[in-house]
Amino acid sequence: MRWILLVAGLLLAPMVSAAQETPEQVVQRYFETFRSGDFAANAAMMDPAALAELKTAMVGVADATGVSADETQAHLRETFGVQNTAELRALEPAVLYERMLRSVLGQGEMREVLSGARVNALGHVLEGDTAHVVYRMSMQVMGNSIDQVQVAPVRRVDGRWRVLLTGSFAAMINAMPAAGIEP
């Protein structure tokens, strides 16, 4: 019986600690996934509703690109690992996001920049079920030091803090219909 309790305690301990993470700890861990290139873990930290919104936008862009079918297919294959928009629609939002990150940030100079970036969460401001985490990011880009203070929004979903899309990214998605692109 003691073995069962010990094993159960060991298995449940990470769940309890994840539920008790502060918004700052979540943002630190989120940026650590960028540093390490663990884009699956990054996607798992995102708000599911934000990922669904992103997927809708990406499918809309793929449908309305105005470029040749060959160019669209090449872009879809390179970015998402799919052959056409039907396959893109079939992807789970978290998988679409992970593949997009891997394509854009997973190699070359961006990979190098991200692996050396440092993030220090400074605090947060609560607004309803959302916390706006203020953090300082320091990195080297082409020999230049960049040091910026920014804000990352997180929302409590099912008892856990989940990362939201930044305001500028969400605004870009919302502007797509005005530009004639149906997300």
Predicted feature descriptions by range:
Residues 20, 63-142:
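Surface-exposed, charged secondary-structure patches
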Residues 16-40, 44-70:
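Short, low-complexity N-terminal intrinsically disordered segments enriched in polar/charged residues
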Residues 5-14:
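Bacterial N-terminal signal peptides
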